[in-house]
Amino acid sequence: MIERYFVTEIGKIWSDENKYNTWAKVELLVCEGWAQIGLIPPTDIEKIKTNLTVNLPRMLELEAETKHDVVAFTRMLSETLGPEKKWI
């Protein structure tokens, strides 16, 4: 964003941190939907809810390595989970 047009509140909306936190919320909602129809066991969805964490520095590091934002994102989320990461 061009600095002279920067408004703090708008800048936060378009920040990488907000973008990846929103993506994580979507992932969690999808997992919750799958759990409701029985595709994800209740124990796994609870672990996902508890442990799903966005780590922006790690995300950017993985993105630099993979050259792909979605691959980096799913890897970053998976690092915060155990075997239940298969649902991400």
UniProtKB/Swiss-Prot annotation:
Keywords attached to this entry: Lyase, Purine biosynthesis
Record: residues binding N(6)-(1,2-dicarboxyethyl)-AMP: 4-5, 67-69
Superkingdom of origin: Bacteria
Gene Ontology terms: cellular component: cytosol
Disulphide bridges, residue numbers: none
Gene3D superfamilies, sorted: Fumarase/aspartase (N-terminal domain)
GO molecular function, one term: (S)-2-(5-amino-1-(5-phospho-D-ribosyl)imidazole-4-carboxamido) succinate lyase (fumarate-forming) activity
Reactions listed under catalytic activity: N(6)-(1,2-dicarboxyethyl)-AMP = fumarate + AMP; (2S)-2-[5-amino-1-(5-phospho-beta-D-ribosyl)imidazole-4-carboxamido]succinate = 5-amino-1-(5-phospho-beta-D-ribosyl)imidazole-4-carboxamide + fumarate
This enzyme's EC code(s): 4.3.2.2
Metabolic or biological pathway: Purine metabolism; AMP biosynthesis via de novo pathway; AMP from IMP: step 2/2; Purine metabolism; IMP biosynthesis via de novo pathway; 5-amino-1-(5-phospho-D-ribosyl)imidazole-4-carboxamide from 5-amino-1-(5-phospho-D-ribosyl)imidazole-4-carboxylate: step 2/2
GO biological process terms, semicolon-separated: 'de novo' AMP biosynthetic process; 'de novo' IMP biosynthetic process
Family to which the UniProt record says this protein belongs: Belongs to the lyase 1 family. Adenylosuccinate lyase subfamily.
Primary role: Catalyzes two reactions in de novo purine nucleotide biosynthesis. Catalyzes the breakdown of 5-aminoimidazole- (N-succinylocarboxamide) ribotide (SAICAR or 2-[5-amino-1-(5-phospho-beta-D-ribosyl)imidazole-4-carboxamido]succinate) to 5-aminoimidazole-4-carboxamide ribotide (AICAR or 5-amino-1-(5-phospho-beta-D-ribosyl)imidazole-4-carboxamide) and fumarate, and of adenylosuccinate (ADS or N(6)-(1,2-dicarboxyethyl)-AMP) to adenosine monophosphate (AMP) and fumarate.
Assembly with partners or alone: Homotetramer and homodimer. Residues from neighboring subunits contribute catalytic and substrate-binding residues to each active site.
Protein name: Adenylosuccinate lyase
